[in-house]
Design a protein with these regions (language model features):
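Glycine-rich nucleotide/cofactor/substrate-binding loop typically near the N-terminus or early
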Residues: 45, 54-93
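Conserved mixed alpha/beta catalytic, RNA-binding, or beta-rich assembly cores of soluble enzyme
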Residues: 24, 30-32, 40-56, 60, ...
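Catalytic cores of large soluble enzymes that bind and process phosphate-bearing ligands
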Residues: 1, 5, 45-49, 78-82, ...
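Glycine-rich, aromatic-bearing surface loops/beta-hairpins
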Residues: 78-144
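Generic secondary-structure signature for well-ordered alpha-helical cores
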Residues: 6, 10, 14, 18-22, ...
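Structural motif
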Residues: 24-27, 41-42, 64-74, 101-103, ...
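Long, hydrophobic N-terminal alpha-helical segment
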Residues: 1-46
Length: 144
């Protein structure tokens, strides 16, 4: 155990966050997502909600402010502009941890799958809400 670090951040996830560099992406996905077949390192967070894991990650990892958008969700199938309550929760987390970077962009389902294949790692949660999938692009920590 460590002080001031969310216990949802397992040793494996902490090591992954530390190893990631500027511009690397991390996918945090729901229980229905085919994480094991993504071809990426899969970190299990069974029993955890995607929003709780995202909050823990965002408490330590800066988002990329060199790009127009650093956070992405999977669009609702057959409804490119469809909004779900979980998307509002993602936005609230972005506003809390990265107020200047609170933009959240939807990506078509199959394009999302392809993007996840390029992510540094995938965190597979126990989230049961549909479309509980999020990609975060790592930024930089500026010197004090």
């Amino acid at each position: 155990m460590l002080k001031n670090i969310d216990p949802l951040l397992s040793p494996e996830l902490l090591s992954t966050l530390r190893a990631m560099g500027h511009g690397d992406e991390l996918a945090i996905v729901d229980a229905n997502y085919p994480a094991a077949s993504s071809g990426r390192q899969v970190i299990r967070a069974d029993g955890s909600q995607v929003t709780a894991v995202a909050a823990a990650v965002l408490s330590l990892m800066p988002l990329d402010d060199f790009v127009p958008c650093a956070a992405f969700h999977m669009q609702v199938v057959d409804s490119a502009g469809g909004q779900l309550p979980i998307f509002d929760e993602f936005r609230a987390l972005l506003r809390k941890y990265e107020p200047k970077l609170a933009k959240l962009e939807g990506i078509e389902r199959f394009a999302f799958y392809e993007r996840v294949k390029k992510c540094f790692a995938v965190v597979a949660t126990g989230e049961r809400r549909l479309y509980g999938n999020l990609i975060l692009k790592k930024g930089i920590v500026r010197p004090d």
